[in-house]
Amino acid sequence: MTLKSAQPPLINKEFIMRYLALVGWLLVSLNVMAEEPKIAAKSNEKDLPVPELQSFVTKHKGTFNNKSISYTATVSNMHLLNDKGEVIGDAVTTAYVAESKNDRPVTFVFNGGPGSASIWLHMGILGPKLVSVPSDAQDAGNGPYELINNPYSPLDKTDLVFIDPIGTGFSQLAGKGSAKDVWGLSEDAESVSQIVKLWVSQNKRWNSAKYLAGESFGTTRAAAMMPYLDDRKSPMRINGLMLISQALDYTGSTPAEDNLVAFVTYLPTLAATAWYHHKIEQTSISLEKLMTEVKAFAVDEYLPALFKGSTLNEQQFNHIANKLAYFTGLSVELIKRANLRVTATRHAKLLLADQGLAVGRLDSRYSSDEIDDLALTPRYDAASVAISAAYTAGLNHYLHHDLKVSWQRDYVVSSSEVNKGWVWDRGLEKGKEPKYVNTAPDLALEMRKNPAMKVLLASGYYDYSTPFFDGEYTFARHGIELSRVTQTYYAAGHMMYIHQPSLKKLAADIHQFIESK
């Protein structure tokens, strides 16, 4: 139906002028709004600031492994360049170089994450100072915290260079740099290799023996760096790798429901944790004997049972369930309800559930009081929250007071921005299926190219992040030259050095590793 409009009223001249003015104002406003994204886009194209090169140099003296050592500490930055010679990053290192007439080895140190600064190895075992935290898996409390001399530092045997990859510590993107340049498995390996080579060139240390020491993802990085260090352009050989809490092949350290391998590699860690928390009677079996038994069961009985799956008969199913209940400290009923599959995260939540507690991920000796006792996984990592504030405060105090660093920006201990933005594949071709991260073949290849390179593999029994049995599994199946690998174990977790007896043992093992031929 069509409605007839009424006769329009007469419009006077004043109304027309006001109307035109309003239209003009709207057009101007719309034009400004349309141009704003162009302005924003143009601002995004601007280069990031490029910090000036600075060095903070201090002189010190300390006693390490009963030897008096005079050394220079240098906190300095360097500019990382892309293939065009443009600055993409500003990398900061902390170096300790002893006064010596001899050509000493130099060890390059980094932690993992990805997105973690080198604070843990720096202030936990290798540097000249230690952050003092309780050895018995108790919370470190609130400040002030104690910084103590580290008599176990290997400074008597090797110079040390602590590397904070871009986005961690004081290191940052700069100039033309963006996340895609450095925050990926291959990109990170290349950029950290560039840091190593730059430091060696700037300090005239090309002919020194060289070691890499990495922890957790830092071990992934160390292996991934091999093709970038020992390349055709400027080949550099590494004398040895110190892999602390290794994570080379992620198949065995990814506790997913459909990953049968991880149920096997994690089981000894679950058993060690059950033993530590008295869910397995300690007087009836030692930790070492328990580990021997559980590893044999995991490989000889548990893995075949997982592969058989629903074809297991009732007798076989019940046998495996009873053995798992013993090794994990959980009830037979719960094991059966889980279809013989209890992930590490579920075990961390369930083991001490009768006490309203969950065990820690980085170190399962720790436990936390859970708000929600019915949740499937722990709310947070008891080990991490127990020590992180102490390490952060201790390092910042040390940098600004002892090493005289005057930068006012934050020292980024752990970057969620780096971690969440990480690109894990290594240039995966289109049409190819994704797979677990694995840098073990890089290590195996380099050990063949460099027949004198040696490896130290250090693992903690109570580590739910990188289970120690996965280290054995990884090194046994990738063609790695085991005759040049030293495997050591500690009654602690991921950062085993926060446990005083393990600190002493790992320090001695590192000392012996550097001295060995």
Language-model features: locations:
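C-terminal subdomain of alpha/beta-hydrolase-fold enzymes, centered on the catalytic histidine
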Residues: 244-245, 249-262, 330-515
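N-terminal cap/lid subdomain of alpha/beta-hydrolase-fold enzymes
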Residues: 36-43, 85-181, 476
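Alpha/beta-hydrolase fold nucleophile elbow
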Residues: 205-216
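A catalytic-pocket lid/entrance helix-loop region that shapes and gates access to the active site
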Residues: 230-312, 318-323
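Glycine-rich nucleophile elbow surrounding the catalytic serine of serine-hydrolase chemistry
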Residues: 214-227
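Alpha/beta-hydrolase active-site loop
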Residues: 155, 182-200
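N-terminal cap/lid segment of alpha/beta-hydrolase-fold proteins
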Residues: 52-95
